Amino acid sequence: MITNKKKFFTEILKGILKLVVAGIFIGFFKEYDFWIALILAAKIFHNIYKDIIRPKNKNWLLLVGMLLTCFGGIVGETWGVANGYWEYHKVTRALPLWLPFAWILAFHYLYKLELKLIPLLKNKSQKNKIFLALLLALILPAFGEIITIYLGVWTYYWPYQLFGVPLYAFICLVFVHMLVYTILHFICKKYKINDVVFN
């Protein structure tokens, strides 16, 4: 299934390392949500310039995916906190200011990782791409959550937890990411956009 296993797993390990660094950063500075938001916003503007504005072929699909993920994520966060399913700590508001930026970066992170991993698949069929997307959306965001949960950023109150992350949260994370991926797939199909990840 994989042409170069060493490179494939090296990219995944590099991705996990990025999550660890981000999780520790948010965990240690959780009470300074404004400053975290500012730093994450700067990172987003850097990514937009580097990946969308500067290149000759503009990848507007990436920006659409980032905005859709942000919208879906914040709707879910608002619903979850309002219903008492989880709670953020050490902030003066229900939702920390950095949250929308974290959702935007989550899409960018998964998309860029898939861009590196898909060329390493022997069979680049839609089925294999979907399987890879499901696997990454199931494992990696939850891995980042485990770190921040253990550093006291938030607490889930749902049952059936694995390292502080409940089964329902795994399902919600996959749902948001796969819904965005499905929308982007149909955008690519309708407007005949050639994208390694979505078609």
Segments predicted by a language model, with ranges:
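Aromatic-rich, lipid-facing transmembrane alpha helices and their immediate juxtamembrane interface loops
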Residues: 1-199
